[in-house]
UniProtKB/Swiss-Prot annotation:
Keywords: Iron, Lyase, Manganese. InterPro entries: Man_deHydtase (IPR004628), Xyl_isomerase-like_sf (IPR036237). The keyword Hydrolase does not apply. Pfam families: UxuA (PF03786). Catalyzes the dehydration of D-mannonate. It is an enzyme of class 4 (lyase). Its cofactor is Fe(2+); Mn(2+). Pathway: Carbohydrate metabolism; pentose and glucuronate interconversion. PANTHER family: MANNONATE DEHYDRATASE. This is Mannonate dehydratase. GO terms for biological process: D-glucuronate catabolic process. Its EC number is 4.2.1.8.
Length: 394
């Protein structure tokens, strides 16, 4: 695997020098300063590429080119936003950058309720608490019909939890959910959030799939033409939330994408932390079935709790994700490609790490502190080395 590291650009609290010392050779980044939907010019792409290469690294993967909400709702100026996206792909290819991670999650990107969940060893992790989320949705956001998405027990627990929250607890929970986490391109006030949710009131799973198909049928031929590999990131968490449909959550969703546009440019990001939240997702089987189309991996781990819809970011090698079998399947896919004469390694980043050690005393981006990701990268690197030596060094 190609070892990579997500970097949020010149304002990132983790420097490119830090990235190189961590042992990564590739950088995963995006032009976050360009408004959603606008074309990334060749000039701006080359500026960022030069910064990365001057640090002795390569720009391996774009994560992400945001998809304008008009495209997802099939309203407004969606045709122009699609044309802009096509041009950005052409410009990236012209600059030699050919792997693009993206997602099709409506309104929100990845979602957590607690950004400072304290683990038994004193380090901090990200957490999604189903009951806190229900309390937010029913008692703070007050979304009409929200109760239909929860069990009677969850509704009662959410009311009890809300009753114990201070004003600061409520404000913090609201910020965590709607203010935008690292990598998210949108943050909202409560009123703005309600208005954005309203745009989806008539969009169910079938309609969102229809809108996604329009996007794929416009984008994938361009990607194929210029040699760019599109790698869709799964929903996080991988299930409907806030009354919003989710359409990249299961192996059936992956198959639907392939059936909709059967091009090798139409591929996947294997995010084990996102897919792994669902107990019915067999990660190794997913890799084996869709291995030739996996162009990027996020190797992180999650642990489901007593309520199976509650989870936290766990240690990379101690979670519901069998990291050994996952890495083995990825390495096997790389060797399959090599046997076909392809030399491309699959870029991997350790994704979210725990806030730990000296980083506990620093300001950090939630999930993206340096030391926790350094630990995760080193652990995954060790697993891969052991697998390579044991099975492929003959």
């Amino acid at each position: 695997m190609e070892q990579t590291w997500r970097w949020y650009g010149p304002n990132d609290l983790v420097s490119l020098a830090d990235v190189r010392q961590a042992g990564a050779t590739g950088v995963v980044t995006a032009l976050h300063h360009i408004p959603n939907g606008e074309v990334w010019s060749v000039e701006e792409i080359l500026k960022r590429k030069a910064i990365v290469e001057d640090a002795g690294l390569v720009w391996s993967v774009v994560e992400s080119i945001p998809i304008h909400e008009d495209i997802k709702t099939h309203t407004g100026n969606y045709e122009q936003w699609i044309a802009n996206y096509q041009q950005t792909l052409r410009n990236l290819a012209q600059c030699g950058i050919r792997t693009v991670c993206y997602n099709f999650m409506p309104v929100l990107d990845w979602t957590r309720t607690d950004l400072e969940y304290v683990l038994p060893d004193g380090s901090k992790a990200l957490r999604f608490d189903q009951i806190e989320f229900a309390a937010f949705e029913m008692h703070i956001l007050k979304r009409p019909g929200a109760e239909a998405d929860y069990t009677e027990e969850e509704i009662a627990q959410a009311a009890e939890r809300f009753a114990t929250m201070s004003d600061e607890d409520k404000a913090r929970l609201t910020r965590n959910i709607i203010a935008g986490l690292p990598g998210a391109e949108e943050g909202y006030t409560l009123d703005q959030f309600r208005k954005h949710l309203e745009l989806y009131k008539d969009i169910d799973k079938a309609k969102l799939r229809e809108n996604f198909a329009v996007f794929l049928k416009a984008i994938i031929p361009v990607a194929e033409e210029v040699g760019v590999r599109m790698a869709v990131h799964p929903d996080d968490p991988p299930r409907p939330i806030l009354g919003l449909p989710r359409i990249v959550s299961t192996i059936e969703d992956m198959q639907w994408m392939v059936d909709t546009v059967n091009s090798m440019a139409n591929g996947f990001t294997m995010c084990t932390g996102s897919y792994g939240v669902r107990a019915d997702n067999d990660l190794v089987d997913m890799i084996k079935q869709f291995g030739p189309r996996i162009y990027f991996t996020h190797l992180r781990s999650t642990m489901r709790e007593d309520n199976p819809k509650t989870f936290h970011e766990a240690a990379h090698l101690n979670s519901d994700v069998d990291m050994y079998e996952v890495v083995k399947a990825i390495v096997e896919e790389e060797h399959r490609r090599k046997a076909e004469g392809k030399e491309d390694l699959i870029p991997m980043r350790p994704d979210h790490g725990h806030q730990m050690l000296d980083d506990l005393k620093k300001k950090t981006n939630p999930g993206y502190s340096a030391i926790g990701r350094l630990k995760g990268l080193a652990e995954v690197r060790g697993v891969e080395l052991a697998i390579q030596r044991a099975f492929f060094s003959r």
